[in-house]
Amino acid sequence: MGAHRSTLRSRRTLVPAVMAAALAVATAGCGSSSNSASSAAGGAASASHSSSGGGSTLTVADVAPFTGTDGALGPTYLVSCDAATSAINSAGGVLGHHLNCKSVDTRGDPADAVPAVHQMYASGSPSLIIGCTSDEAASVVPVFGANKTVSFCMTGQAEFDHVKFPYFYRLVPPDLSESYAMTAMAKNKGYKRVALAFGNDIGSQTFVAPAIAAIKKAGLTLVANETLDLNSTTFRTEAAKIAAAKPDVVMTEALGPSEASFLTELKQLNGGKMIPVIGTSATISPDWYKSVAAAVGASTLASNFSADNLVTQTSGPAYQAFSKAMFAEKGKVGSTGNFSTYLTAPGAVHLYDGINLAALAMTAAHSTSPSAFMPYIIKIGDGAPGAVVVHSFATGEAALKAGKQIRYEGPGGPTNFDAYHDSAGLFQVDRYSPTGAVTVAGNLSVAQLRALGL
C-alpha cells in the first residue's frame, strides 16, 4: 500500500540495511527523541500485558505519518482505530479492559520513526500497533518484534513477503501485486501507451519496477516514466514530458498536494483535456479526492479516473457493523471530502479488521499477552471446520462465551494467512462519482493477473 519518503537508493539495498540497523538498536532501550506521540483519545497510557481482566486501558498505537508529505495517512488510520475501539468498548471491552487509540507520528521518515517508536515504548508499551506504512515499516517492525508487540501494517514492501517477523501481520497486498492489477486494468480498457508518474517516496517507488515488468508482459508500451519530487510545488517539466509522449493512460501515486498540482499541469499541457489516470489503492482516500477534484474538476476526475483496490464488502452484516462504527466518528473528523470514502479506503477497512481480529484473539485466549493471543489471530481469521462466522467484535465475543469456535469475516472479507502472516484478497476496480462517492466498476480475476506473470 503505497507509503512513503523520498530516496534515490534502491529500496532492495536500503531495506535490509535499515532492518539490520533497527534490530541492532531495538534492545538498546528507549533513549532519545521527542517526536509526536500524543494520545488521540485523550486517555490513559497503555496497559501492561495482563492475563486476565482488570479494567486497565489497552492502547492501540497508530504508528504512521501525521505530518510531512504523507501526513494524510495517519489520520485516516486513526479514524478507523477510533471506530473499531469505540465499538469494542460499547460491547464491554476486551476481558474487562477498554481500548483507546494513540497517534505516533513517524513523519514518513525512518530517521524520525525509530526515535518516535522508542519514545512510545518509554511511555508504556501498547497492546497493539497499526499503521506502519512503507515509509517506516522496514525500520520499525523489527523494533516492534523486539518488544513483542503485535502489529497490523499497511506496508506493501515485497521484503515482507518472504522475511518472517513473528509479530507482524498484513491484510493488504504487496505493491508488486498492485502494479500488476493496474496494468491489467489498462489492458482491459484497451490502452496501448502507458506513462508512469510516481512520487519519489519509498512506498510510491516500490510500484515502478514491477509496473515496468508487467507493462512489458502485457504487450503494452511504456512511453514515459517520471518521478515526482513530493517537496516540489510544480511539476511542469515532468508533465510536459508525459504530455509530449502522448500516453493513453497515466499510472500514478503521489500523495499529499503533489498529485493535484501534477495532474493540473498535465491537463493544461494536454490542451485542457485530462489524460485517463489509473491510481493505486492509496488514491482511494477522502483527502486525495478532495485535493484532486478541486484541482481538475469533480466531473472531469470522475470521467477519467479508476484505481485498483482489494475487494471489500458493500452490503451485509460486516458492512453494516463497519459503516455504523465509522459514521459514529463522522462528527469528530474535520472536512476531508466525502466521508463515505472511508468505507472503501484500504487503511480504514483493513486496520478495522486487524483491530477486531486482535481483540477477538485476546478474548479467545483469555489473555492480552501476545504470546498467548497471537496463535488465535490466524485461528479466528482463517477459521476451522464448523466455525461460526461472525462479522463484528460483539457477535464474536458472544459466540466465544457460548463455547463456539469462530471465524471473523469483516468488511475486508475472509482472510487466508500464509506463513509470513500475509493475507490479501482479490482486486476490484474503483471509480469516483462526481460527488466523491466510491463506486465499484468491476473485479479483476486471478486469471487476468496470472496472465501477466503474477
How would you label these PLM feature ranges?
Residues 2-22, 26, 30-454:
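Extracytosolic ligand-binding ectodomains
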